[in-house]
Amino acid sequence: MRFLVGAVLVVVLVACATAFESDAETFKSLVVEERKCHGDGSKGCATKPDDWCCKNTPCKCPAWSSTSECRCAMDCSRRCKGKRALLLPVETHRLLFPEQW
């Protein structure tokens, strides 16, 4: 019985780890996939970068947003390390884009 419970626990842990890895890849592809803003009054576009992004960072809309929900989708430059892109928590950004840290 103990062996069966242990085996089930291992299977569940492996399934969770695989699901998390798959979700992370999907999320990363969403973050990376982006399109240009139309600008002209769209929030966070053209004239004013999103507050969470570095100044002078080109702004784009994430692929899943409408133009009224633009966010600064470009990676923040190294000199602005610690800022967030796409309102991601710093730890999530660090996991998705380790080459920037």
UniProtKB/Swiss-Prot annotation:
Residues 20-35, 85-101 form a propeptide. Expressed by the venom gland. It is found in: Secreted. GO terms for cellular component: extracellular region. Keywords: Amidation, Cleavage on pair of basic residues, Disulfide bond, Ion channel impairing toxin, Knottin, Neurotoxin, Secreted, Signal, Toxin. Disulfide bonds join 37-54, 45-59, 53-72, 61-70. Its main location: secreted. The modification Lysine amide is found at residue 81. GO terms for molecular function: ion channel regulator activity; toxin activity. Residues 1-19 form the signal peptide. The presence of a 'disulfide through disulfide knot' structurally defines this protein as a knottin. Toxin active against insects (S.frugiperda larvae). May act on sodium (Nav) or calcium channels (Cav). Belongs to the neurotoxin 28 (Litx) family. This is U1-sicaritoxin-Li1a. The lineage of its organism: Eukaryota, Metazoa, Ecdysozoa, Arthropoda, Chelicerata.
